[in-house]
């Protein structure tokens, strides 16, 4: 246990500013990745002579964002769960309703978190997939229905690998350098877990950058608006951040940041889901809430329509939430207005207000001092949120920024700064939480206050609290509370072999050194004995260096085969969905179309294609099966079915005349 010394207080470089040097040998592209809770995006600098040329890279489906969803097909490898096929992005989202317990979304809310965290326990009640406790480190992990255990970092790495491959296909060259964004209020454990995910994906993560800072880079890189105080209000799928930045002639300095790492669109969706369930069981009293909530497929379908309703009400005043056969033979049709949505989610919206006020206070400015308010994250499209932001700052937010893309663009700009493609731009970010150590009586002794510019290095002198101590245990904490029991323990450093002296006499120099990623190094040295010790505070993200190396080696050994199987599986998945949609339509409108002469032929062809898909699923490793042929036949069948419906509709109209 340490006792804070009354002797010399050393303050070293507390506001160190880093001007990134260029490396003429570094010519590879550095991609910028927004690893979002709901959607992710990747960007690059298109023209090294144009700092405004940051460009989003479209994925293989031509979309500018990719759903942050990873699914496992447990049927693909019954004998070896480690060889299961994976689906990523939209391919995973399409099959979510029929494979909900093996489809992992919003896992960013779990990354770097302990299983016992109250936020994790709250998520367990609403997530259709299984969240389990890792016995070795107490972290929240994920489990498929057949028992494959994955850390959130491993799930994120699958998504990052997909974005890496997307970039390589687009750029026509190998990519291994990246800047990845994280919520500004992510702690050290969550940041390290994100870096681990990048490493697993085969990426050298040059920098982890805060999402609001990236958005400000994207906004302020334009010479016409490169001066002033900027507030970035970032409400995404799972996290909320507010950052205050001062932009002046290419220098981006973060003045303050605050937020909530467990507040976002997922919480809004859950409120709507609960409203729908309440309405449904009120209209169907014979059905209990427990029956609904325990049905994974039903809950996933409810979540999907809740998300769609939320999006609709950002553009229209009223919508209808409709689901046929939502439970057993019951159908769902619930009207919802924009005002109703506002009222039921107001408590969530109001949770963003205290962090905004605290950030303004920490930056020592008033709302009227802000020149521009930038909105980031899909949730900021909600009119009520825009209204609250306008009231908070006394001005309408800037609407020139795409809230889904600006973070990835900013990450690409930061990548351009690091590679030397972009010059004369300086980024000064901050540490979001206070860092310190435990001293006598369990007190928290801060060394680096929150909102200190990073990188930063600071040393302070401490002493012993007991006579004759030959060693000290230095516990490193992160948080804002006066007692360590209310803060987060992130590291433990033991210094032994010091000269036994009366308490208060030994001089123990404790140094905190935070790099530009926000990763912390701590060292301690005792003056008289010369003993010293140091650690890099890498909170347990769930994976050791050996485990990470092994996973990377396994991934490299199987990359070509994995890619081919993934492509075949995605083609079949699309064909399967098309066939299912056609089958459902034929059943629903059988009376209308059964008299058409093509009807029986198409029904037989549907059966044949269904059997072909079934054969493929039973023999997925048989590379002789013509997957492309199945997909082409499905496309042709869908076209014939459409013509059949058009003909039947026309005949019905003629009969009614």
From Swiss-Prot:
User: Can you supply one Gene Ontology CC term for this chain's record?
Assistant: cytoplasm
Q: Provide an example Pfam family for this protein.
A: HSP70
Q: Which SUPFAM superfamilies match?
A: Actin-like ATPase domain, Heat shock protein 70kD (HSP70), C-terminal subdomain, Heat shock protein 70kD (HSP70), peptide-binding domain
The chemistry this enzyme catalyses reads: ATP + H2O = ADP + phosphate + H(+)
Query: What happens biologically when this protein's gene is inactivated, per the record?
Result: Disrupts iron-sulfur (Fe-S) cluster assembly. Normal cytosolic tRNA thiolation.
Q: Does the keyword Metal-binding apply?
A: no
Enzyme type, top EC level: hydrolase
Any single GO BP term? intracellular iron ion homeostasis
InterPro entries documented for this protein: ATPase_NBD, Heat_shock_70_CS, HSP70_C_sf, HSP70_peptide-bd_sf, Hsp_70_fam
What PROSITE patterns would the database entry show?
HSP70_1, HSP70_2, HSP70_3
Molecular function via GO? ATP binding; ATP hydrolysis activity; ATP-dependent protein folding chaperone; heat shock protein binding; protein folding chaperone; unfolded protein binding
- Tell me which UniProt keywords the record has, alphabetically: ATP-binding, Chaperone, Hydrolase, Mitochondrion, Nucleotide-binding, Stress response, Transit peptide
Location of this chain's protein in the cell: Mitochondrion matrix
Predominant subcellular localization, coarse grouping? mitochondrion
Q: Which domain of life is it from?
A: Eukaryota
Q: Subunit structure, per the record?
A: Interacts with the Fe/S cluster assembly proteins ISU1, MGE1, GRX5 and JAC1.
Q: Which PANTHER family match?
A: HEAT SHOCK PROTEIN 70KDA
Other notes: Present with 5550 molecules/cell in log phase SD medium.
What protein family does this chain belong to? Belongs to the heat shock protein 70 family.
Main function: Required for the assembly of iron-sulfur (Fe/S) clusters in mitochondria. Assisted by the DnaJ-like co-chaperone JAC1 and the nucleotide exchange factor MGE1, it mediates ATP-dependent Fe-S cluster transfer from the scaffold proteins ISU1/ISU2 to GRX5.
Question: What is the protein name stated in its UniProt record?
Answer: Iron-sulfur cluster biogenesis chaperone, mitochondrial
Question: What's the source species' lineage?
Answer: Eukaryota, Fungi, Dikarya, Ascomycota, Saccharomycotina
- Gene that produces this protein: SSQ1
């Amino acid at each position: 246990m340490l006792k804070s010394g009354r002797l010399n207080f050393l303050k070293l470089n507390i506001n160190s500013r880093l001007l990134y040097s260029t490396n003429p040998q570094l010519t590879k592209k550095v991609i910028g990745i927004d690893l979002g809770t709901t959607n992710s995006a990747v960007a690059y600098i298109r023209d090294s002579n144009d700092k405004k040329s940051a460009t989003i890279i479209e994925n293989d489906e031509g979309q500018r964002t990719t759903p942050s969803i990873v699914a496992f097909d447990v049927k693909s490898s019954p004998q070896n769960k480690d060889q299961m096929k994976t689906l990523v992005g939209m391919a995973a989202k399409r099959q979510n309703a029929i494979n909900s317990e093996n489809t992992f979304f919003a896992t960013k809310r779990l990354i770097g978190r302990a299983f016992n965290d109250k936020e994790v326990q709250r998520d367990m009640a609403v997530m259709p997939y299984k969240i389990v406790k890792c016995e070795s480190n107490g972290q929240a992990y994920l489990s498929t229905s057949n028992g494959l255990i994955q850390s959130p970092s491993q799930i994120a790495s699958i998504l990052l690998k997909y974005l890496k491959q997307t970039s390589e296909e687009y750029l026509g060259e190998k990519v291994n350098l990246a800047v990845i964004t994280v919520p500004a209020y992510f702690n050290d454990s969550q940041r390290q877990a994100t870096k681990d995910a990048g490493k697993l994906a085969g990426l050298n993560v040059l920098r982890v950058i805060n999402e609001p800072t990236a958005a400000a880079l994207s906004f302020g890189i334009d010479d016409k608006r490169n001066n002033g105080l900027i507030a970035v209000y970032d409400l995404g799928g799972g996290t909320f951040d507010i950052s205050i930045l001062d932009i002046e002639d290419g220098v981006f300095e973060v003045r303050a940041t605050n937020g909530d790492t467990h507040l976002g669109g997922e919480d809004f969706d859950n409120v709507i889901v609960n409203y729908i369930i309440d309405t449904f069981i009120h209209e169907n009293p014979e059905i209990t809430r427990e029956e609904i909530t325990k049905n994974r497929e039903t809950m996933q379908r409810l979540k999907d329509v809740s998300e769609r309703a939320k999006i609709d009400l950002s553009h229209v005043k009223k919508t209808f939430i409709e689901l046929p056969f939502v439970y057993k033979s019951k159908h769902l049709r619930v009207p919802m207005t924009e005002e109703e949505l506002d009222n039921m989610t107001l408590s969530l919206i109001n949770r963003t207000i205290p962090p905004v006020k605290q950030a303004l206070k920490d930056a020592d400015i008033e709302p009227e001092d802000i020149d521009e308010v930038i909105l980031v994250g899909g949730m900021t499209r909600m009119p009520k949120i825009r209204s609250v932001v306008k009231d908070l700052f006394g001005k309408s937010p800037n609407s020139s920024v795409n809230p889904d893309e600006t973070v990835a663009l900013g990450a690409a700009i930061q990548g351009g700064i690091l590679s030397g493609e972009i010059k004369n731009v300086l980024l000064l970010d901050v540490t979001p939480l206070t860092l310190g150590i435990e001293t006598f009586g369990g007190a928290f002794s801060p060394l680096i206050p929150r909102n200190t510019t990073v990188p930063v290095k600071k040393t302070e002198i401490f002493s012993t609290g007991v006579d004759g101590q030959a060693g000290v245990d230095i516990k490193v904490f992160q948080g804002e509370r006066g007692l360590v029991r209310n803060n987060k323990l992130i590291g433990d450093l033991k210094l032994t072999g010091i000269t036994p002296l009366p308490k208060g006499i030994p001089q123990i120099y404790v140094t905190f050194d935070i790099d530009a990623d926000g990763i912390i190094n701590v060292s301690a040295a005792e003056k008289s004995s010369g003993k010293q010790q140091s650690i890099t505070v890498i909170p347990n993200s769930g994976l050791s260096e050996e485990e990470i190396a092994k996973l990377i080696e396994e991934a490299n050994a199987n990359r070509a085969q994995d890619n081919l199987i993934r492509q075949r599986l995605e083609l079949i998945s699309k064909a399967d969905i098309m066939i299912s949609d056609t089958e459902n339509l034929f059943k629903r409108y059988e009376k209308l179309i059964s008299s058409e002469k093509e009807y029986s032929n198409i029904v037989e062809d549907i059966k044949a294609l269904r059997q072909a898909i079934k054969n493929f699923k039973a023999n997925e490793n048989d590379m002789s099966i013509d997957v492309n042929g199945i997909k082409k036949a499905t496309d042709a069948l869908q076209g014939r079915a459409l013509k059949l419906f058009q003909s039947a509709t026309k005949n019905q109209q003629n009969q009614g005349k």
